[in-house]
Amino acid sequence: MKRLALWSMMLVLLLASNGWGRQESLTAEEKQKLEKIDRVLVEVIALSDKGPADPAPFIEVVTKRMKEFGYTVVTDPAQPHDVTFNIKCEQHKIWEGTTKMGSDADLPDSPSRLWKGPACQLSYVLESKKMPWRKEVRTDFVDAQQAAEAAKAGDPSDYAMSKLKERLEDYDFPALITAEWGQEERLFKVYDDPATSSARKVRLIGLFGYLFETKAVPRLLEGLKSNDIEIAKASALALGNIGQKDTVPMLIEAMKNGQPELRPSAAKALGVLGALHGDFTIVDPLLETLKTTDDVNLKIEVAWALGKLPDRKAQEPLVALQRSLYHVRENDADPKLVKLKEAVNWSIKQIDTWEYLQ
């Protein structure tokens, strides 16, 4: 049992997201204040190569989008507010971060030291304390002059500012900041709104998993049965991240009989859940699926899952599969087979290591 507990603890450490670790650094008092935020002061700085630019278009976008989640937005610092949401948009971005890598710096929408083109940096201040949450949106070009000429768009500074405004209209920062503040009820309200797009629902489901939000489980179980395959897949992965053991039977059913595109995601979630709880009941369904499916994508996720909860009974089937993949090389024409071989080799090593520890 001690070895199993150690293995599960190692898995939890591997699964813990950067956002989770940062949230754990907040004090209990700070978390309580974040959860009660309603009045948001929006402050925007816009800088082009010509000097200060008009912040009004950015303020309009941010105000409109924050209201989607029910926040009361103010723009006058003299008015009562719970938090200050800062947006700095520049034609040539000036770096304001402190680290090149690690923590949130490794996330795709975090501020980049290397990017010198048009960008908007997003952050917030709680009671005069600048919080570590940082996000950044960038244009798809670095040189606004060249981009404006290619688009025949006139002034490059105006073009850069207009494109940054478009990025803020597309980027779902209101959902991200709401998750950061731990206000799941606002997330649920938007998710439950019939007018919410499928793409946004998928992003929200990902945030439910990020928050390890157990209150989201009923919605995710419904999502698992959705005809919208992207919602179903995202729901499966979020259930794995949240880690409620009583969702294992539903995920097994989804892996065995769900839509073909859903089954790999369900297998992946089972690997996480099984290892988290030391639940070896998932091994037989995984092995049965490995034996009966011809779907390489599903085989890949099943193989990875079997390695996350090493069981001796999985070794023989995995070794047999490994032998059938001896001919596969790293530069093989079929990248799926390369991934399958990698997953099988890794899982066999985990089983061997587990046996050694015992």
Task: Please place each PLM-identified region on the residue numbering.
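A structural "domain/chain start" motif
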Residues: 20-64, 174-177, 189, 203-206, ...
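Alpha-solenoid repeat junctions
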Residues: 208-212, 239, 243, 270-278, ...
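C-terminal/domain-edge helix-coil "capping" segments
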Residues: 20-33, 125, 129-203, 211
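Amphipathic alpha-helical scaffolding segments comprising HEAT/armadillo-like alpha-solenoid repeats
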Residues: 175-192, 213-225, 244-256, 276-291, ...
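Surface-exposed short loop/turn segments
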Residues: 84-134, 352
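Conserved hydrophobic register position within alpha-solenoid helical repeats
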Residues: 201-204, 235, 266, 302, ...
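Alpha-helix N-cap/helix-start positions at coil->helix boundaries
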Residues: 196-199, 214, 229-230, 245, ...
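Short acidic low-complexity segments
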Residues: 69-82
